[in-house]
From Swiss-Prot:
Similarity comment: Belongs to the peroxiredoxin family. AhpC/Prx1 subfamily.
Protein name: Peroxiredoxin-1
Family matches, as Gene3D superfamilies: Glutaredoxin
Entry GO terms, CC: cytoplasm; cytosol; euchromatin; mitochondrial matrix; nucleus; peroxisomal matrix
Chain residue numbers at which the record places covalent cross-link Glycyl lysine isopeptide (Lys-Gly) (interchain with G-Cter in SUMO2): 7, 120
Protein role: Thiol-specific peroxidase that catalyzes the reduction of hydrogen peroxide and organic hydroperoxides to water and alcohols, respectively. Plays a role in cell protection against oxidative stress by detoxifying peroxides and as sensor of hydrogen peroxide-mediated signaling events. Might participate in the signaling cascades of growth factors and tumor necrosis factor-alpha by regulating the intracellular concentrations of H(2)O(2). Reduces an intramolecular disulfide bond in GDPD5 that gates the ability to GDPD5 to drive postmitotic motor neuron differentiation.
Residues modified to Phosphothreonine: 90
Subcellular location: Cytoplasm
Coiled-coil ranges from the UniProt annotation: none
Xref: InterPro entries: AhpC/TSA, Peroxiredoxin, Peroxiredoxin_AhpC-typ, Peroxiredoxin_C, Thioredoxin-like_sf, Thioredoxin_domain
Catalysis performed (reactions): a hydroperoxide + [thioredoxin]-dithiol = an alcohol + [thioredoxin]-disulfide + H2O
């Protein structure tokens, strides 16, 4: 795995690349296009594989939930945009993706994967890296899975909601926090209000 330039609390590495958009067209997009929105940017190893379509379809199927949070989901792999399009045009029952509600970025030179520290250099593919970038372009969360295990869309939604809550209210979110749950005031005395309710 490459070390990369992605660091929590710092600007996310910028990129410009060709993507297959939800309308099936090719378009050059960059991270800066999404300034003012949260971005969930996730890498997957390869098109036409096994775990990858389950993750991509899960994110695509719930793209509207992210959109309601002013959050754009973007997928990326080292495959060409032509390969992405062929996979999108392959029926789900044949291992394809079917129509997508999220852009899929092409990173054939592996520069984006390297910048984000997810390149598995010996195979020339990406680990399952996922990055939550806030509306100011600051990297707030990083997870990187080894190849055989997919990610949870529920957890990513929860994390986006939690970061947005802390941005807005200045309180911090305890383990397992969900919207509507108690939060903690980040102050020695005021935090007792939360802890006094614990069993």
């Amino acid at each position: 795995m490459s070390s990369g330039n992605a660091k929590i609390g710092h600007p996310a590495p910028s990129f410009k690349a060709t993507a297959v958009m939800p309308d099936g067209q090719f378009k050059d997009i960059s991270l800066s296009d999404y300034k003012g929105k949260y971005v969930v940017f996730f890498f997957y190893p390869l098109d036409f594989t096994f775990v990858c379509p389950t993750e991509i379809i899960a994110f695509s199927d719930r793209a509207e939930e992210f959109k309601k949070l002013n959050c754009q989901v973007i997928g990326a792999s080292v495959d060409s945009h032509f390969c992405h399009l062929a996979w999108i045009n392959t029926p789900k029952k044949q291992g394809g993706l079917g129509p997508m509600n999220i852009p899929l970025v092409s990173d054939p030179k592996r520069t984006i994967a390297q910048d984000y520290g997810v390149l598995k250099a010996d195979e020339g593919i990406s680990f399952r890296g996922l990055f939550i970038i806030d509306d100011k372009g600051i990297l707030r969360q990083i997870t990187i899975n080894d190849l055989p295990v997919g990610r949870s869309v529920d957890e990513i939604l929860r994390l986006v909601q939690a970061f947005q809550f802390t941005d807005k209210h200045g309180e911090v979110c305890p383990a397992g926090w969900k919207p509507g749950s108690d939060t903690i005031k980040p102050d020695v005395n005021k935090s007792k209000e939360y802890f006094s309710k614990q069993k």
